[in-house]
Amino acid sequence: MSNLFVRKATGLVRSWSVFDAFIYAFFSINIVTLGFYSFSQMYFFGGGMINALVVSAIFLIFEIIVYSSLIAVMPRSGGDYVWMTRIFGGGTGFILAITGWWFTLWLWTPIYGDMLRQFVITPLLGVLGQQDLALWFSGKGTPLFVSTLIALAFVSIVIALGMKTYARVQKYSFYAGMLGLLILIIMLFTGSQAAFKSGFDNNASALFGAQSGAYDATVQAGTDAGATTPISGGALNLVFLTLPWLVFFNLWPNWGATLYGEVRGATDYKRNFAGMAWALGAVTVLGIIFFLGVAKTIGWDFYMQANGAWWNYAWGYVTDKPPLPVWPYPALLTVFLTGNRLIQIVVILLMSFWWFGWAGTLFLSSTRVIFAAAFDRLLPEKVAELNKNGTPINAMLLMVLPAIVVSYLYAYNVGAAPDGTGGFYTATLAATQGIAIMYFGTAIAAIVLPYVKKDLFNASPIAQMKVAGIPLITISGLIFGGFLAFLLVEWMFDPWLNTGGEGAGLYGISFKNTNSIIFLLVCYILSAAIYYGFKAYRKRGGIDMDKIQTEIPVE
């Protein structure tokens, strides 16, 4: 086997504990960054948020079963890439995994940069009295590009320092962030709507220069934007319509699956399942508590109206800035309950650790997929090299350098019409779609694994896990795959809304958004070109790629 791969063993070390993997899963479905960000955009739905949160979690349990099972069978760095290439064969697995984990993640870079400024830079500058700079960072174009470059620098450094260092960073961030969230929840459940209204008007003016009466003006702006999403209730079909947007936040408890070649005890299915399931359960409960706290003190209707007012402007539907001229970050809104600047600074600082503990998820998982492909000789051997910290540094550069270009195109919306419509921004709406398509491929691989790789399955720790004689991994793959199929159909066609084929529907990534579709197709074509190009190149050198992708590499 040693002459098949780049070297005899990958050289990656199992330096993470199961608890480290739990924290990574917990941060991957981050209630603050991904959660608060996604919730704020979901102001125009008819299904209740609590209902949608619970329903999505039920389906995602089957995702966790699928990934925990595959990890136990093949606990190798590269995750989806390794599983699909070994179960399907090289071409399909490579194209789906490389598009999902490599090219699509470039599109997430400016989103991480946007969250850095909205969750950390702008609110901190505001409570520190730097009003002009805070307002500058909340603007479009250059402020977004600058914050994205800062985010990229942090992510690159923390990943380059290796898995042990990253584990410490995320662990300390976990404790600090949880303390901040606990303070936030206490403030929400002990405050009153009357105190919040007064505090909002005072702080919005003092910190960000809002006009007097900002609270009432926000109510009007949000109402005009169509803010209607309820905290709970709604017909079942309306709840299901909410899910394709909500999963931008919680579809990722498996995000660390590509790293399990570096996790101790990864062949233990129960430990794998527990780590991801506890993360999903904890985040779901925290989400419900957050919603209830918001409803008590901020007021649910006002929260949605503030969100609608901001995104109606940010998405270009109106040109006038909202009464609160910065994103309505829930932590910022909560500290408006007090005029004590020290308390505001401490809470915002503690809450910022939700971003710092999570930021590495941007590229950390992806580097292992690129590394695994290079180890299989489907990319240059240099990409499989490790630095002294055990990081595939060249694989990371293949994420970072293109991400800078993508972030520039996104921040300045290159190619947009004079009225601001279209442009590169619309192409990035496929950021979730491309990953979900890859997950669908992995779900299919899980379904067929017991039948096409019988010896491997029968020798695995999950061989006896069956329901009515059917492998649990197959049943779970069918359910999770069905859920993904629903999401993909909704994103592509919006069938319950666009009965006449009009508009882009609720999600903005239907077939009507040609930029997004073209971008995805180009990514798949590029992946196919890399695969078949390297396969032909290796064949000329006497290397059988089909043989390589029947073997499982040694870590």
Give short role names for the model-derived ranges:
Residues 16, 20-34, 148-154, 208-297, ...:
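Hydrophobic, membrane-embedded alpha-helices of multi-pass small-molecule transporters
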Residues 82-89, 219, 277-359, 379-427:
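TM-loop-TM module centered on a large, flexible mid-protein loop between adjacent transmembrane helices
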Residues 12, 142-143, 155, 172, ...:
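C-terminal membrane-solvent junction of multi-pass transporters and transport-like membrane proteins
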Residues 41, 61-152, 362-366, 485:
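Hydrophobic transmembrane alpha-helices that form the core helical bundles
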Residues 18-19, 142-149, 263-285, 356, ...:
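Loop-to-transmembrane helix boundary motifs in multi-pass membrane proteins
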Residues 51, 184-186, 190-194, 425-438, ...:
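A generic transmembrane alpha-helix motif of multi-pass inner-membrane proteins
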Residues 16, 145-211, 251, 273-282, ...:
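Membrane-interface loop-to-helix entry segments
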Residues 1-48, 60-65, 200-218, 531-555:
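Membrane-interface "cap" regions at the ends of multi-pass membrane proteins
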